[in-house]
Amino acid sequence: MKIFLSSHGHLASGLKSSLEILYGNCDHITVFDAYVDENSVQEQIELFFETVEEDQQILLISDLYGSSVNQAMSMYLDRPSTTLVAGANLAFLIGLMGRDSITREELKDLIEQSREMLCIVNLEEEEPSSQEDFF
């Protein structure tokens, strides 16, 4: 599985930096920080797809559903074995680590788990039950 992660500003490279601190080398993840220079999302996705092998599963991940970055990435959904996920967060990306592939059902479960990691933390409440299972 190859991953293309893009965001407005430096969020994408920051998320990859965090993953590399936790997991080491993440060569299977290509990042593009949009709107920080003259390069476009479309140009970078085209370069990314030049590195993709015919039988590889592709996961495109954007920071925000419906945004310009997400819309640009959606133009590539007609490519074989390509899926687009919006709303990148570190919990979601951690769940992808160590996987060679992921089914649609597993992807839905991982998205739900990563949503649960976004919560208000109160001292008197227990941590979400899925947190132990997640890590």
Please place each PLM-identified region on the residue numbering.
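N-terminal loops that bind phosphate or other acidic moieties
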Residues: 2-135
